[in-house]
Amino acid sequence: CIDSSEGFSEWQKLTIEWVREHYGDTVKIGAGNVVDADGFRFLADCGADFIKVGIGGGSICITRETKGIGRGQATATIEVAKARDEYYERTGVYVPICSDGGIVHDYHMTLALAMGSDFIMLGRYFSRFDESPTNKVVINGQYMKEYWGEGSARARNWQRYDLGGDKKLSFEEGVDSYVPYAGPLKDNVAM
């Protein structure tokens, strides 16, 4: 997935073109994130196989505060789902959308699907379980799991990213936090 808080961008277009040029349709491309119909149409026309929806709605995301961009997750999902359906009517190509952000409670999944999302990003939800790669810690007598987002300084310090350019122009878009520990995944998620 070509993951960015600014998915409606020339960078995403060039990246999708590069992947298509080198790998054709053998690689499925997810792109995003976007929050409106124009962003969806742009990425769909660029050739994305699925599109992520949401800027600033994640539980540990601070993009709205640091960059001044974003939109409510429900509003974004509804508008992009409508654009997806119109795109399908016009082209015959169905481009699924992924609601990315704002899932804290179980019922939020139902809401995201009811608003038109085809599938859901569940970072915070799954970070609570034994299977997540983070440490289990005790805070004020309660077991918690560490949790941080890809836009946080902690994730960037792993040096997985070649951000290029001037480091002073880089924005931190996420924070570190904790979520209540929930035990093993198999005891909590029906399969």
Feature roles, as predicted:
Residues 1-16, 27, 32, 36-79, ...:
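Glycine/Thr-rich beta-alpha phosphate-binding loop at enzyme active sites
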